Each structure stands twice: as C-alpha cells, then as structure tokens.
C-alpha cells in the first residue's frame, strides 16, 4: 500500500474577487463595525449616567452610616458614664 502524501496539492483559484468587490466588502464591514461601535458608545453613555446617579446615592448612604455610627458611639458612651456614676453613688456611704 502506498501512503498518501501530506503535502497539499496546489489549486488554482480562477474566481478571485476583483479589487472593487474587495473594497465594497471591506466598506460594508467597516459600516457594520461603526454601527456596532456607535451602539456600544450609546450603552456606555447610559451606564455612565446611571453610575453617576448611583455614586451620589452611595455617598449619601456613607454619610448616613457614619452619622449612625457616631450617634451609637455617643449613646454607648453616655450609658457607660451613667452606669459608672450610679455605681459610685451606691458605694458612697451617707
């Protein structure tokens, strides 16, 4: 048995596209890519707008959290002071 060769056979292509056809194909492809790019830019603009709104809301939430943390610290501090003053009053003989 004889092995077939691995070397590709040469095929001559007689129907290669003309330069004007290639140019038309490339222009159509560029137009498609440009429309996709414009669509993506529009989506990006919408996402940036939403992100700006969300960033402001997150800033306000951060300020609210900080104020709650400071208020709870003050309440805990006042409760500790009150508890220690009550303990001192009980220890003092009259």
Curated annotation (Swiss-Prot):
Keywords assigned: Cell cycle, Cell division, Centromere, Chromosome, Cytoplasm, Cytoskeleton, Kinetochore, Mitosis, Nucleus
Predominant location: nucleus
This protein's name: DASH complex subunit DAD5
Ranges of Low complexity composition bias in the record: 1-20
Gene Ontology BP terms: attachment of spindle microtubules to kinetochore; cell division; mitotic sister chromatid biorientation; protein transport along microtubule to mitotic spindle pole body; spindle attachment to meiosis I kinetochore
The organism's taxonomic lineage, starting at the top: Eukaryota, Fungi, Dikarya, Ascomycota, Taphrinomycotina
InterPro entries (alphabetical): Hsk3, Hsk3-like
Record gene name: dad5
Similarity annotation: Belongs to the DASH complex HSK3 family.
Superkingdom assignment: Eukaryota
Localisation per UniProt entry: Nucleus; Cytoplasm, Cytoskeleton, Spindle; Chromosome, Centromere, Kinetochore; Cytoplasm, Cytoskeleton
Described purpose of this protein according to its UniProt entry: Component of the DASH complex that connects microtubules with kinetochores and couples microtubule depolymerisation to chromosome movement; it is involved in retrieving kinetochores to the spindle poles before their re-orientation on the spindle in early mitosis and allows microtubule depolymerization to pull chromosomes apart and resist detachment during anaphase.
GO terms for cellular component: cytosol; DASH complex; nucleus; spindle
Region annotation (Disordered) ranges: 1-25
Subunit structure: Component of the DASH complex consisting of ask1, dad1, dad2, dad3, dad4, dam1, duo1, dad5, spc19 and spc34, with a stoichiometry of one copy of each subunit per complex. Multiple DASH complexes oligomerize to form a ring that encircles spindle microtubules and organizes the rod-like NDC80 complexes of the outer kinetochore. DASH complex oligomerization strengthens microtubule attachments. On cytoplasmic microtubules, DASH complexes appear to form patches instead of rings.
Native organism: Schizosaccharomyces pombe (strain 972 / ATCC 24843)
Pfam families named in the record: DASH_Hsk3
